[in-house]
């Protein structure tokens, strides 16, 4: 059995990136304890790792962008075009397939179906009742959600709401709390509870249209929960309970007592960037694209997706791939002009006196030069034998 110090020294000499060295060292320690490896066996494993790593490296001049576009684009043609139910949570709809991929690469600020997966801390994750307590704190509840029936009394100029007792109890509220919350938020009306009937009497309202406006505001008013979050679903996964939410408010959900902030996640990449930073957003882009592809039974080498995520987050903010993002901001005038709105780009560049260095693929194709990809990246100079100069 080889000492840990020796293994560390052997791994540190290998020509590998630091993250692979760390992983290799951890694996070697594990296998060394399990199989009592000899020094030459450990060296053989390190050499094999270096060989495999070198085989995985791209050749200089490889057109990685084209290969990535093809590798992601081709399987995308086999994807479904409609919104399906989220795997395992039939009650919550979430965008899948090609529309979801487009949403991610377009870097849309508001996904069409935002959803959060909320994991709970040690105290709450194994007990359904405790998980329900946390779900109640998160779930957004409006008067409309609690109402069984609502009427506008024209004679008395009142808005009358019949509250469903079951829904009220499920939301963890009572009539007194409802009246208190509404009274604190609306100074232009009086609220009175008669059993499970809520009567709203607007002050200084003479027109029916004004009464309707107030009624609309009152019924949409949030009584509890996080803004942007609709219903919540509790599911058992393995031996723990997990909460799924329709709608997302990542910043606030991490502060809710009972939530495990280290595992909770959202499918809104902009929220992740704002709360956890750009590196987390990059990982989220990779994860979302990979899981969307997998959902459709498609496997794409993660390195193509990582390249896309790297390009989208390169400047420290999320940028879409397209006219308003990466392609529209290329340094080359000709590349921008070849993509979209040609004349506008050319006139603007001429006005500013821009010079195109012709470093990219598109601009070289445009003017008929060999592209700087593959063998085109190599510049050859011929060494001719020196001959004496003729007089």
Swiss-Prot record:
<dbReference type="Pfam" id="PF04998">
    <property type="entry name" value="RNA_pol_Rpb1_5"/>
</dbReference>
<keyword id="KW-0238">DNA-binding</keyword>
<dbReference type="InterPro" id="IPR012757">
    <property type="entry name" value="RPO1C"/>
</dbReference>
<dbReference type="GO" id="GO:0003899">
    <property type="term" value="F:DNA-directed RNA polymerase activity"/>
</dbReference>
<dbReference type="GO" id="GO:0000428">
    <property type="term" value="C:DNA-directed RNA polymerase complex"/>
</dbReference>
<dbReference type="GO" id="GO:0003677">
    <property type="term" value="F:DNA binding"/>
</dbReference>
<dbReference type="InterPro" id="IPR007081">
    <property type="entry name" value="RNA_pol_Rpb1_5"/>
</dbReference>
<dbReference type="GO" id="GO:0005694">
    <property type="term" value="C:chromosome"/>
</dbReference>
<keyword id="KW-0240">DNA-directed RNA polymerase</keyword>
<dbReference type="GO" id="GO:0006351">
    <property type="term" value="P:DNA-templated transcription"/>
</dbReference>
<dbReference type="GO" id="GO:0005737">
    <property type="term" value="C:cytoplasm"/>
</dbReference>
<comment type="subunit">
    <text>Part of the RNA polymerase complex.</text>
</comment>
<keyword id="KW-0963">Cytoplasm</keyword>
<keyword id="KW-0808">Transferase</keyword>
<comment type="function">
    <text>DNA-dependent RNA polymerase (RNAP) catalyzes the transcription of DNA into RNA using the four ribonucleoside triphosphates as substrates. Forms part of the jaw domain.</text>
</comment>
<keyword id="KW-0548">Nucleotidyltransferase</keyword>
<dbReference type="InterPro" id="IPR045867">
    <property type="entry name" value="DNA-dir_RpoC_beta_prime"/>
</dbReference>
<keyword id="KW-0804">Transcription</keyword>
<keyword id="KW-0158">Chromosome</keyword>
<protein>
    <recommendedName>
        <fullName>DNA-directed RNA polymerase subunit Rpo1C</fullName>
        <ecNumber>2.7.7.6</ecNumber>
    </recommendedName>
</protein>
<comment type="similarity">
    <text>Belongs to the RNA polymerase beta' chain family.</text>
</comment>
């Amino acid at each position: 059995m080889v000492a840990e110090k020796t293994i560390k020294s052997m791994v540190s000499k290998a020509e590998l990136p630091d993250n692979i060295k760390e992983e290799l060292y951890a694996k070697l320690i594990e296998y060394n304890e399990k199989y009592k490896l000899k020094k030459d066996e450990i060296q053989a494993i390190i050499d094999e790792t270096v060989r495999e790593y070198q085989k995985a490296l791209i050749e200089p001049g490889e057109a990685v962008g084209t290969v990535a576009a093809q590798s992601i684009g081709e399987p995308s043609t086999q994807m479904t075009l409609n919104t399906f139910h989220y795997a395992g949570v039939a009650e919550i709809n979430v965008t899948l397939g090609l529309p979801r991929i487009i949403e991610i690469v377009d870097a849309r600020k508001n996904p069409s179906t935002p959803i959060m997966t909320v994991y709970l801390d040690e105290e709450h994750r194994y007990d359904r009742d405790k998980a329900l307590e946390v779900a109640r704190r998160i779930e957004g509840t409006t008067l409309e959600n609690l109402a069984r029936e609502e009427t506008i009394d024209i004679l008395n100029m009142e808005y009358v709401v019949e509250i469903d007792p079951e829904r009220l109890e499920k939301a963890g509220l009572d009539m007194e709390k409802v009246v208190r919350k509404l009274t604190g938020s609306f100074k232009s009306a009086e609220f009175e509870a008669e059993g499970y009937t809520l009567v709203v009497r607007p002050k200084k309202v003479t027109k029916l249209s004004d009464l309707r406006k107030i009624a609309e505001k009152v019924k949409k008013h949030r009584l509890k929960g996080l803004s942007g979050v609709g219903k919540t679903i509790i599911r058992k996964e393995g031996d723990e309970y997990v909460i799924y939410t329709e709608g997302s408010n990542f910043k606030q959900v991490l502060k809710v007592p009972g939530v495990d902030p280290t595992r909770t996640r959202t499918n809104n990449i902009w929220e992740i960037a704002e709360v956890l930073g750009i590196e987390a957003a990059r990982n989220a882009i990779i994860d979302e694209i990979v899981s969307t592809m997998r959902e459709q039974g498609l496997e794409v080498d993660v390195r193509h997706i990582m390249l896309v995520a790297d390009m989208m987050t390169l400047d420290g903010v999320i940028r879409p791939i397209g006219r308003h993002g990466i392609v529209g901001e290329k340094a080359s005038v000709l590349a921008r002009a070849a993509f979209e709105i040609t004349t506008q780009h050319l006139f603007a560049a001429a006005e500013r006196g821009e010079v195109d260095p012709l470093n990219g693929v598109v601009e070289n194709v445009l003017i008929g030069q060999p592209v700087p990809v593959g063998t085109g990246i190599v510049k050859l100079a011929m060494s001719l034998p020196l001959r004496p100069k003729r007089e």
